[in-house]
A protein has these predicted regions:
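N-terminal polybasic/positive-inside topogenic patches
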Residues: 39-43, 60, 79
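Extended, well-ordered alpha-helical scaffold segments
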Residues: 89-97, 136-149, 208-229, 331, ...
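Long, repeat-rich segments with strong aromatic
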Residues: 315-342, 442-449, 453-458, 462
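Low-acidity, Ser/Thr- and Arg-rich intrinsically disordered low-complexity segments
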Residues: 5-11, 18-26, 35, 39-41, ...
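Bacterial Sec-dependent signal peptides at the C-terminal "C-region" and cleavage site
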Residues: 21-28, 61, 71-74
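Extended glycan-interaction surfaces of carbohydrate-active proteins
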Residues: 80-120, 146-184, 238-320, 357-443, ...
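Internal, well-ordered domain-core segments that constitute the primary functional module
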Residues: 193-255
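Alpha-helical support elements that line or immediately flank enzyme active sites
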Residues: 125-155, 390-401, 448-461, 468
């Protein structure tokens, strides 16, 4: 096996180098502390329901609508066919997942997790809608309507919508200083999952009238958002859009961003206090050096009034992200499908042009030697030397040809032999792999859901089944966490996590 080039402490100067380069192989102090923390906090074998009373901004038990979970698990009002639950094998997961969505419901939108993430996040909401579909179709549509109601005039749909104030998250509305959305929002976006969810809800809808009405209303907003991507992030018409902030990628501290982020010169920042570290062990979160740069970019964009042309030209971080581009391409396929269902033939041709261009452009991101797709740094023009779980997402996008798909399946099989649970977010043989640190190693249910969808589309059903069963086992054994250690299975990050719950429902109750 060819070892990828590693960002070692000696190849990166100064303090930053030592903080970006990790030493999971020997196990540094951070890593050991995090493992001890994870095993102390992991929920033991029986999956638990979230506590109903909550500090943390959670609604009081008395404010919750009365819930008869057993009855709901039995009468599935969306009509989705229970997949493997005839034996009741997954009834505890179903029950807990539904309860999590209800407890994280803030009225038309779902927060990802109490305390840690108290607002509406973009791709979280789009994926969570798929979970809501198994409880309440109307509520599933509302999730998407609420997200798209925050759309900016230029078409962008922001990465966070600040519906109500919260002291538990930083940086909040006062730092972003954007007034475009009625309730305030960030000034960047996230991977555009929404059109994919609209198609799925539309296809599985029982209430066809509601589905047609809502999809027809949402369609122009989705089209405007996709147009924004090409105007704002691909002004040269390459077929691949740029990502200007690691938060836009959704895979915030991916090793793929290390070198590009290291080149962002840190501004003189006002003093700040990270609230995430009050909720989660610091060894499971991005490092300070990364946060300083995240904030530097936020202030840079704010000072440019979030003007889309200025941002593209002045951002000191600009990459071609596989996750965003795979999701955008898949979303275009689904948007085109929707255009045909609702009689928007006028949009069909425009979307077809995007699809054709991207289909070809994706080949420039395939690394035949590594047998995986890679991101590109747009400021250096170089392919980024990091194999991450995003490298499998071209399967979800359907842009891989059959030989590329076979190579990806083989790569995935090699990765699975190195860890107990797949899919790790970074190649487990890479020295940058850290099994508990957020997007640098842990398993994420949402990524697994997209990878399994892609594997099945290319006929790798058995491999898809393995990844799906790994995820359900993780949840069953450890709880519905934000992410999981691929080596030990320990749950990490936030607990009672909405999109993990939603993916379980989407898998177990899939139509
Ligand atoms: O760490 C954070 O504060 C936020 C910033 O957007 O990102 C994480 O959390 C968000 C909420 O779950 C996700 O959408 C992102 O992909 C990421 O996992």
């Amino acid at each position: 096996m060819v070892m990828p080039k590693v960002a070692s402490a000696t190849s990166m100067p100064g303090l930053l180098a030592s903080s970006f380069a990790c030493t999971n192989v020997t196990g540094d102090m951070d890593d050991l502390k995090a493992r001890a923390f994870a095993s102390a906090t992991a929920t033991p074998v029986n999956i638990s329901l979230p506590p109903k009373d909550g500090a943390d901004g959670a609604p009081k038990a008395s404010e919750q609508s009365s819930i008869n979970l057993k009855a709901e698990a039995a009468s599935n009002n969306s009509g989705l066919r229970p997949r493997a639950d005839a034996s009741g094998k997954y009834s505890a997961i179903i029950e807990a997942s539904k309860e999590i969505l209800k407890q994280n419901d803030r009225g038309g939108y779902t927060i990802p997790a109490k305390g840690l993430y108290p607002y509406q996040w973009n791709w979280d909401s789009a994926l969570v809608a798929l979970g809501w579909a198994s409880l309440d179709e109307t509520r599933a549509w509302e999730e998407l309507e609420k997200l798209l109601s925050a759309q900016w005039n230029d078409g962008m749909v922001p990465h966070i919508v600040f519906h109500q104030p919260s002291p538990t998250y930083f940086p909040g509305p006062e730092i972003w200083g954007s007034v475009e959305s009625p309730r305030g929002s960030t000034g960047i976006t996230q991977p555009p999952v929404a059109a994919i969810s609209v198609r799925r809800l539309f296809e599985s809808a029982h209430d066809k009238e509601l589905a047609l009405k809502t999809a027809t209303e949402l369609f122009p907003k989705l089209l405007a958002w996709h147009r924004w991507f090409y105007k704002a992030r691909d002004p040269e018409g390459t077929g691949l859009v740029a990502t200007l902030h690691p938060w836009e990628s959704g895979m915030d501290n991916s090793p793929a961003w290390d070198e590009a982020l290291e080149r962002v010169p840190v501004a003189k920042l006002p003093p700040y206090e990270r609230r995430d570290l009050g909720h989660v062990n610091s060894a499971m979160r991005p490092r300070k050096e990364e946060y300083d740069r995240y904030l530097t970019l936020v202030y840079l964009f704010r000072d440019a009034d979030y003007d889309l042309k200025k941002l593209y030209n002045l951002s000191t971080f600009r990459v071609t992200d596989l996750c965003t581009n795979s999701i955008l391409h898949r979303a275009n396929l689904d948007l085109q499908w929707l255009a045909r269902q609702i009689g928007r033939d006028d949009a069909d041709q425009e979307i077809a042009t995007w699809i054709a261009r991207t289909q070809v452009a994706f080949n420039s991101l395939y690394d035949p030697a590594a047998q995986i797709y890679k991101c590109r740094d747009q400021l250096t023009g170089q392919m980024i030397d990091a194999s991450t779980s995003a490298g499998f997402l071209p399967l979800f996008a359907r842009v891989a040809d059959t030989a590329q798909a076979a190579a990806l399946a083989a790569t995935l099989e090699r990765w699975l032999k190195k860890v107990r649970y797949g899919v790790p977010s970074c190649d487990p043989t890479d020295a940058r792999f850290e099994p508990l640190r957020y997007w640098r190693g842990p398993v994420w249910a949402i990524v697994n859901w997209m990878i399994t969808d892609g594997l099945r589309a290319y006929g790798y059903d058995a491999l898809a089944e393995t990844v799906e069963l790994h995820t359900l086992e993780l949840v069953e054994q450890h709880g519905i966490y934000e992410y999981f250690d691929p080596v030990t299975g320990a749950g990490a990050g936030g607990s009672y996590f909405s999109w993990t719950a939603a993916m379980c429902l989407a898998w177990i109750l899939r139509p």
